[in-house]
């Protein structure tokens, strides 16, 4: 995940990545996740993907896969029901 605490004025500004049950988001080292984005549960973010400002990705009901080089723009919410 290309986000370095040293590159932000406030080291506490990191994406909110939350487990849900036994599932935890997995983010590629080359993906960008904005500091105020939220990832929950069974979510994977592929290489070169971007999750932009205010986006929420909820894998609490079923898996969500954000493919390589995809992007989710500002303030979008992604959620899926089984």
Which positions does each model-derived feature cover?
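Terminal amphipathic alpha-helical/low-complexity segments used for targeting or macromolecular assembly
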Residues: 1-30
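A structural motif detector for beta-strand N-caps
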Residues: 25, 30-33, 37, 43, ...
């Amino acid at each position: 995940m290309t986000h370095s605490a040293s590159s932000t004025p406030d080291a506490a500004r990191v994406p909110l990545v939350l487990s849900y049950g036994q599932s935890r988001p997995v983010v590629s080292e080359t993906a960008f996740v904005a500091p105020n984005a939220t990832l929950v549960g069974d979510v994977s973010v592929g290489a070169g993907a971007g999750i932009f400002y205010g986006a929420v990705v909820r894998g609490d009901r079923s898996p969500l896969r954000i493919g390589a080089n995809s992007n989710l723009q500002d303030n979008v919410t992604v959620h899926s029901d089984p």
